């Protein structure tokens, strides 16, 4: 009988502890109910220059003016939606005290137009869609990571910077003097560009794909990164591909390429008047040239060229090859 009582008391204690832990875990979790409700709040001002979106929220900036913000969210989540303006930063997120897990959230925040933005940042699967055209201002920097997404209609600024990482995505149209874009860790940047100078980096399976026109492009791809710019017409181009990185270009005046360690560069749409190609360690360059070509291939590197160019300088060694196709 005593043993039976001990076992019963032990089981009761285990059940009580399990229930206690379950209750505590439920408090630390927030799961959207699917029942969407709405409310409208008013911003302190609408002249912030930095916007940060986090925790899976969907933010839409529309053409409306004023300071009113509409929030559509699950009825058990809407009270935890934060739209907080501190100094020059507007933060939009979901924040429940002591909560460590958020799932199945349905949160849409609609903002009025604000052309004062100089910095946009999205994290943790948040998304931002900017509908208005921004036709004034000097700079705009966009940073996205952790599966977040930014889509812009049209941005016109002197300088535009984009940094995407960890499966994040950026899409849009940009008119600027200078564009710098970097994609890493399976992130993707896809944009239409009209710029004087474009600088691109792609690494760790990141991808940058651009179309449009530029005076000068500088591109670097490494560690299986991809720069796809065959639909971006460029007067001058400099490209370097290493460690299985891939670059496609379209340069019609001057082209300078270097490919090593199985890097791959292709520029065959337009014929560059002057071209330089250097390959080594299994690197590959394929180009179109109508004027003079300086080519150097070593250690199993391959250069293939077409067009009416003449070889001003040609060097091969250690299994490197230079061939016309």
How would you name each of these model-derived features?
Residues 1-325:
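Intrinsically disordered, low-complexity terminal regions
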């Amino acid at each position: 009988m005593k043993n039976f009582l001990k076992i019963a008391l032990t089981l009761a204690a285990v059940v009580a502890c399990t229930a206690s832990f379950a209750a505590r875990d439920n408090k630390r979790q927030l799961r959207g109910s699917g029942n969407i409700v709405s409310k409208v709040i008013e911003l302190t001002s609408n002249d912030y220059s930095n916007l940060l979106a986090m925790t899976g929220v969907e933010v839409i900036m529309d053409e409306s003016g004023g300071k009113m913000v509409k929030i559509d969210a699950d009825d058990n989540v809407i009270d935890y939606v934060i739209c907080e303006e501190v100094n020059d930063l507007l933060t939009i997120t979901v924040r429940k005290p002591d909560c460590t897990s958020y799932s199945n959230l349905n949160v849409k925040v609609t903002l009025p137009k604000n052309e004062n933005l100089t910095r946009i940042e999205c994290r943790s699967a948040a998304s931002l869609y900017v509908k208005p055209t921004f036709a004034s201002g000097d700079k705009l920097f966009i940073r996205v990571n952790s599966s977040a997404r930014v889509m812009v209609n049209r941005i016109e600024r002197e300088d535009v910077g984009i940094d995407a990482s960890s499966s994040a995505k950026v899409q849009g149209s940009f008119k600027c003097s200078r564009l710098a874009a970097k994609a890493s860790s399976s992130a993707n940047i896809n944009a239409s560009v009209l710029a004087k100078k474009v600088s691109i980096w792609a690494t760790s399976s990141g991808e940058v794909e651009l179309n449009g026109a530029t005076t000068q492009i500088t591109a670097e791809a490494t560690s299986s990164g991809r720069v796809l710019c065959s639909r971006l017409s460029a007067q001058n181009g400099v490209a370097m591909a290493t460690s299985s990185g891939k670059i496609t270009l379209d340069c019609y005046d001057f082209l300078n390429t270097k490919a090593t360690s199985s890097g791959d560069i292709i520029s065959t749409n337009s014929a560059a008047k002057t071209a330089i190609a250097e390959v080594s360690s299994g690197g590959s360059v394929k180009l179109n040239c109508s004027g003079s070509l300086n080519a150097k291939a070593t250690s199993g590197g391959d250069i293939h060229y077409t067009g009416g160019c003449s070889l001003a300088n040609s060097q091969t060694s250690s299994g490197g090859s230079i061939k016309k196709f």
